[in-house]
Amino acid sequence: MTKTLEKTKTCLNLIGGEWVKSNTGKTFTSYSPANQEEVIGSFADSDETDVKKAVDAAAKAFETWRKVPAPERAEIILRAGLLLEQHKESLAKDMTREMGKVLNEARGDVQEAIDMAKYAAGEGRRMFGMTVPAEMRNKFAMAVRAPLGVVGIITPWNFP
């Protein structure tokens, strides 16, 4: 008999600031690796169409985001890090249930995310360029750092 949580959570895709079902409308069920009868939750079974929608929404949002002053972007990223810190224990427990990772290692993974968010927030205050002398008397070379655009990554998070 499958054991479910008091309330099985159904997770949707966050695209364009809205929680939406997958293009197919299908979901899949995730089970605890420690107990295959324990349901972790139900998740949107996404496809290439969903990925394209997400990338397009991110590209559209980037046009506004890139105009936000770097120190303000830094504050937003710092708040994200502080939220991770506030919910560290529950996030670590969720990771343990979902992946079978030992709790102390999951706590370490969440701490790495917290540390990276705080680091990135600090970098928001260092969005400056540099100038260097040029070969000609009345000229100089200038480099300015600026956001490039949407980046998609797939990271491994399997365990052990």
Question: How should each PLM-predicted stretch be described?
Answer:
Residues 13, 21, 96, 118, ...:
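Short glycine- and Lys/Arg-enriched binding-loop motifs that mark or flank ligand-binding interfaces
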